[in-house]
Design a protein with these regions (language model features):
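Alpha/beta-hydrolase active-site loop
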Residues: 159, 181-203
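Short beta-strand/loop motif that positions the catalytic acidic residue
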Residues: 214, 352, 357-364
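Accessory cap/linker subdomain of secreted extracellular hydrolases
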Residues: 249-349
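C-terminal catalytic histidine-bearing segment of alpha/beta-hydrolase fold enzymes
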Residues: 339-340, 380-439
Length: 439
């Protein structure tokens, strides 16, 4: 059965509920909030031995596509793929995603480059997977709302002639496990292995000499930042030319406080669900401290997309989910083993490979600006090549998501321009020396 590990009671911490299908290629489809997940997303019983090995692939019809003058689809031709990665426990895991071959020519130096894009927060239900959103950019049903808001960044890269591979992350889309939201190792490994998988696809125009970039904002910013840190040890064969990390949740203790009580309070449930699945120390603490309302919320959130979570749990305080009336952050902080487990998720303890552009909105109160800035400081102290960009905007509303989302749009052009310069082989210089003067 499909184990969905939601932190509830000791009797149900590993399988809070089961979907009506096998984790392998069985006859019964998995249905998440009324959406039938294609059988493609059911992992096989046996996985390849090599990280990044392609398990299967198929054509992916893009929901937003037009015929070009030369007959080729614009902005490109997409392939849905499943590939092998390694999770935070060191176990083999199947991950899905998509590769898009652009119709536009690459006009920079060298062969066509590749960007591995890590999506921002989309939810924890399998129907929220970024690869499914490429096919259905706006999915509205009586039970769920999914919006493929990363399409703009993806298509802008494609229009520049850059090939793009998108990861669905561990457990998002694939029906055998729960999505481990903001898990440092899971997301970093999945992004790096997506690069490896893209190079194996038939018909892909990228070559072994193609430059590679990592790109992500919010959850995706954490994933790209993590991947840049992990590359030298986990994937030295992936040659990085640049990494964009926008609004990265590098310090989850601070980020939990920002999310709690916000419009995106449901994301707190996603992180707790994922860590309870992956880490016994956190699971034990959650089981001992979550009340009946909290158990129900964690289970309900585990199949939600962002829109569902905003409607279902917007502005909810996690103190309503605990037996003590304390916030989940305070509960974890009071338990040394649980806090240590959360601290292991900290990004900034390793030097990233290659140049990194880190952007953060100074008014961001969801993924707090201060912890994102601290990541830049931490990297600079390690001698990394960091371009830090503080996005100065007025306060657009406390806890409404606007302070977090608006910089995603306003900074996107500069982020893509910086990335394409790196992919063209242009040099960059760190502005770490300006950090004492930067907000």
């Amino acid at each position: 059965m499909r184990a969905v590990a939601v932190a509830v009671t000791a009797a149900a911490c590993v399988a809070a509920y089961a979907a009506p299908a096998s984790a392998t290629d069985g006859p019964q489809p998995v249905v998440s909030r009324g959406v039938t997940i294609p059988g493609f997303y059911n992992p096989p019983a046996e996985l390849p031995s090599a990280n990044g090995a392609v398990i299967r692939h198929e054509p992916l019809p893009l929901g937003l596509s037009l015929p070009g003058l030369d007959g080729r689809p614009m902005p490109g031709t997409a392939t849905r793929l499943m590939y092998r990665s390694t999770d935070s426990g060191g176990q083999a895991v199947a991950v899905t995603g998509a590769y898009i071959e652009p119709s536009a020519a690459w006009k920079g130096s060298g062969p066509r480059p590749l960007v591995a894009l890590a999506s921002g927060t989309v939810g924890q239900g399998d129907q929220c997977a970024p690869s499914l959103s490429l096919q259905h950019p706006l999915a509205l049903t009586p039970e769920t709302v999914s919006v493929g808001y990363e399409t703009l960044a993806i298509y802008r890269l494609l229009s520049a002639g850059v090939a793009v591979v998108v990861t669905d992350y561990v457990g998002l889309g694939t029906t055998d496990r729960l999505h481990t939201y903001v898990n440092r190792l899971d997301q970093g490994h999945a992004l790096l292995d997506a690069v490896r998988a893209a190079h194996q696809l038939p018909g892909a125009s990228i070559t072994p000499d193609s430059r590679t970039g990592l790109y992500g904002y919010s959850q995706g910013g954490g994933a790209s930042a993590s991947a840049a840190e992990l590359q030298s040890a986990y994937a030295p064969d992936v040659k990085l030319s640049g990494t964009y990390a926008g609004a990265p949740p590098a310090d989850l203790t601070a980020t939990m406080k920002g999310i709690d009580g916000s419009a995106l309070a449901g994301a707190l449930a996603w992180s707790i669900n994922g860590f309870a699945q992956a880490d016994a120390d956190l699971r034990d603490v959650v089981e001992a401290n979550v009340n009946d309302a909290g158990r129900a919320a964690l289970k309900d959130a585990s199949t939600m997309c962002v829109g569902d979570a905003i409607f279902g749990f917007g502005f909810t305080k996690s103190s309503k989910w605990t037996t003590s009336g304390k916030s989940l952050g305070d509960v974890i902080a009071a338990e040394p083993k649980a806090q240590a487990a959360l601290d292991r998720q900290r990004i900034g303890t390793l030097k990233p490979t290659g140049p990194v552009r880190l952007a953060t909105g100074v008014q961001d109160d969801i993924v707090p600006h201060t912890q994102a800035r601290q990541l830049a400081v931490d990297w600079c102290r390690k001698g990394a090549d960091v371009t830090y960009d503080a996005i100065v905007l007025p306060n657009l509303g406390d806890k409404l998501l606007t302070n977090h989302l608006v910089p995603l749009i306003t900074d996107q052009g500069d982020a893509i321009s910086w990335m394409t310069d790196r992919l063209s082989g242009k040099g960059t210089s760190s502005n770490c020396w300006t950090m004492p003067l930067q907000p």
